[in-house]
Amino acid sequence: MIPNLLIQDLVRSRQSLEAETQMEIASGWGPRQKIIGPVLSIPYIEELPGDDGTSIIQHVLRVLPKTMNIDIKLTTQERQKSIYTAILYQSAHEVNGVFDLPKPSRFGKYTTDILWENAVIDIGISAASSLDSVVYIEVAEQRYKMESGPSDSQIFGSGIHAAIAMQPDQDSFTFNSAFTVNGSR
């Protein structure tokens, strides 16, 4: 009779080997993905009065889309190594919507300058290196190339961003983007 402890140890060993093999297969494709956004970031400057004089502080107001539609087409495939199988996927995303621009009163009482020309749109992607191609975003009928990395690591650890030219007289603007990401289960 085989001791129960030996069987449990063998099962744990095989489970560990399966997880390692699946990670190895996925490493050349892409990890599990989480996609967040887009987020519009608008920097602004405040001059705060104080006992020691005026302090000048730069802040960022973050705005989420008023409306957003996402169409995702997902294709999966299995890859095998030895007796182990990993499920890989490729997800094609089409994202569009509308951002309402904030009124100047949303920026705070002591705001002296809203830096509309330094606005940025970010999309958080767990592993942006798994993007299938260069990503563009169209904002108010103008096309911008999205750069690798988030504009501000405080909101996303990884992702893509584009600096966009905004006009303070706009009330809202449309956006759309399409990108494909590789990932694994």
Give, region by region, the residue ranges found by the protein language model:
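Soluble non-transmembrane domains of integral membrane proteins
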Residues: 16, 20, 27-28, 32-37, ...
